[in-house]
Amino acid sequence: GRNYAEHAIEMGHDPSKEPPFFFQKNPDNIVTDGKFPYPSQSSDVHHEIEMVVALAKGGDNIPVETALEHVFGYGVGLDMTRRDLQGEAKKAGRPWEVGKAFEASAPCGPLVPASEIGHPTSGAVTLKVNGEMRQQGDLNQLIWKVPEMISYLSGLFTLQPGDIIMTGTPAGVGAVVRGDVMEGFVEGIGKIEVVVV
């Protein structure tokens, strides 16, 4: 979390480089059918557009210098967030999973192999809702780069082939309602279109 400075600021945090904050979604949170069912437990669900990294091989204590050798490819994803429940968890000093790791909370587009596109380090990251631009950033604004994220994470957990890492979202997060159409794009990787149902 908080891997783009402007998003850190809009969420009330200091954007200076600090160890990244990670949370885990469940494997069944990932959906690819282009639909996001609005969760009944929340009244304030936000979009967060992100580049996702898919691992081809796992490991632990992976050096930064060899981290990219573990990457299969990249995709476009949405980290849908029950902002109201996340806020309550933060105030209580509890983990964020109640706001982040719920059913269908991680819509993802197709994965593109790194063997085809390399390892993107720059390129536009955008999200439109009903045709209106909401989020705009660039991969070159990532505070923690992909090799650093993989290395750091692998020091905390043993990573597995098939693991998906969401890399953070640029500024402009906001609420969606049923009927909204979200169009996410990461330059050089692809796009995703998701309807809130």
Predicted segments — roles?
Residues 2-71:
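Extended, compositionally biased flexible segments
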Residues 3, 7-17, 75, 83-197:
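Catalytic-pocket segment enriched in acidic/His residues
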